[in-house]
From Swiss-Prot:
Induction: Expressed in the intermediate phase of the viral replicative cycle. The keyword Membrane applies. This is Uncharacterized protein gp20. Keywords: Membrane, Transmembrane, Transmembrane helix. It is found in: Membrane. It comes from the Viruses. GO terms for cellular component: membrane. Its main location: membrane. The keyword Transmembrane helix applies. The chain crosses the membrane at residues 18-38. It is a single-pass membrane protein.
Length: 39
């Protein structure tokens, strides 16, 4: 039971969610830099 809980907490799904958040932040940062460069 404890092991299953650990796998759910630190499993692939958590890693994928973290990657999605990081990708979103990077995308917003790049968009902001491009916007400032153009203006």
């Amino acid at each position: 039971m404890y092991r299953k809980f650990s796998d759910e907490c630190f499993g692939p799904s958590t890693l994928i969610n973290a990657i999605k958040v990081i990708a979103l932040v990077v995308l917003i940062t790049i968009s902001a830099v491009v916007y400032l460069s153009v203006c």
